[in-house]
Amino acid sequence: MAIFTPELWLICFAVTVYIFDYIYTKYLMYKLGAKPITHVIDDGFFGFRLPFLITLANNQGRLIEFSVKRFLSSPHQTFMNRAFGIPIILTRDPVNIKAMLAVQFDEFSLGLRYNQFEPLLGNGIFTSDGEPWKHSRIMLRPQFIKSQVSHVNRLEPHFNLLQKNITAQTDNYFDIQTLFFRFTLDTATEFLFGQSVHSLNDGENSLQFLEAFTKSQAILATRANLHELYFLADGIKFRQYNKMVQDFSQRCVDKVLNMSNSEIDKLDRYFFLYEMVKITRNPQVLRDQCLNILLAGRDTTASLLSFAFFELALNEPIWIKLRTEVLHVFQTSLELITFDLLKTKCPYLQAILHETLRLYPSVPRNARFSKKNTTLPHGGGVDGMSPILIKKGQPVAYFICATHVDEKFYTKDALIFRPERWCEEPLIKKNLAWSYLPFNGGPRICLGQQFALTEASYVLTRLAQCYTKISLQPNSFEYPPKKQVHLTMSLLDGVHVKISNLSIS
């Protein structure tokens, strides 16, 4: 009879691996000056319960509340979870976030994002790492300087279409979030390609593009959530959606490539793609970069507008105060509305946008993966303030949504929507820096943040000029609102409002 059965060999092997990993981990901690992580949450055996808890919370529209609750109940701002036995560091500590996104930027990567997003977005600024990303950044940064994103008058034709859709629903409840996503798709495609898809016109082709772009993004989010098993989220429909979006982009690229530089120079308006052609004539590069920017250009602004309007419709005094400011600065004039005045003469408008981005950041959570054995400044030791070990390949998830409700920075009413806090001296004097990151931070900070803020400012200003009363449909929402978290965040149930009392045309 054999002394060592296959089962016994397997047990011996597992024990040997465990002992070796334990010793190696202790060696790395000693070498790098790290302490054991202070707080560990185990959801069942090896964390097998966590993925199911996350899935349940997500299906209920409560993933963000689930995540924030974990941080609020934790004694420290950084802790470790296990999911299927894999250790994952979670943090809302601004110092750790700054380390990953800036101070130790070169030590962390996007992990498998390229593989997960490539079917739709190709090799662009949001999918690439290292030298390819640096090249993209250098190429794209000049396209988002103030002079390129400050022409607010270009938004008015699209606002007229938005207003037409709203007027058709006067005194009826309707989902304005759907209109905001169409509006930002129209403005983003015009800014990028020089031609809008005009989804607010309800044309068959434009709605097909809208559906394809939206559903493809949802599948990309699933691929990201599957981590190494991303390839399981695939299929004919996914590829059809990608092809429809890419074909539109490619047609726009081909049109511009057939133009000479002299023809492009004669244009009296700025379009992203037309300027990019002066830098490169590689059709693949042009298509991929445009699609990468389109994703952010549509979703970030639509999310901001939707959550802002939800709160404005829920809080009539805030809406009245906004209208008072807008009418004082601009009266009912279109000509008076400029980029500079929106930024400098409308502090309450800007406070509303800041507060919306604080409570409802478009990208509420993100992650980085260590490229080498390294440390993060906080999370270890008795008080959780000592460095912790981050092994090569280990994921670190950071939750901006949890950082943004930290009472240390935003006082005890941090969970309440209160724009006035941004006009009060205590918050003005604070150096929020890495505790307020609606557009990420460090070298990968969002290039289009001024584009998004300008567009949102203009739309809210025009709505305040045009309408005196807005209200949410009773029993159509919960508070806090249910959230859908894909690549960006939106309201799961939409924003069903009634807008009445037209002020001006």
Curated annotation (Swiss-Prot):
User: Where would you find this protein in the cell?
Assistant: Membrane
Q: What is its EC number?
A: 1.14.14.-
Q: What is the designated name of this protein?
A: Cytochrome P450 52D1
> What organism, scientifically named, is this protein from?
Candida maltosa (Yeast)
Name the coenzymes or cofactors required. Answer: heme
Q: Where does heme bind?
A: 446
The record's comment on protein family reads: Belongs to the cytochrome P450 family.
Cited function: Together with an NADPH cytochrome P450 the enzyme system catalyzes the terminal hydroxylation as the first step in the assimilation of alkanes and fatty acids.
Instruction: Give me the gene this protein comes from.
Output: CYP52D1
Instruction: Spell out the GO cellular component terms annotated for this protein, sorted alphabetically and separated by semicolons.
Output: membrane
Entry's SUPFAM superfamilies?
Answer: Cytochrome P450
What PANTHER family does the annotation carry? P450, PUTATIVE (EUROFUNG)-RELATED (PTHR24287:SF1)
| Gene3D superfamilies the UniProt entry points to | Cytochrome P450
Q: What is its main location?
A: membrane
Q: Which GO terms describe its molecular function?
A: heme binding; iron ion binding; oxidoreductase activity, acting on paired donors, with incorporation or reduction of molecular oxygen, reduced flavin or flavoprotein as one donor, and incorporation of one atom of oxygen
One Pfam entry name? p450
Disulfide topology: none
Q: Recite the UniProt keywords alphabetically.
A: Heme, Iron, Membrane, Metal-binding, Monooxygenase, Oxidoreductase, Transmembrane, Transmembrane helix
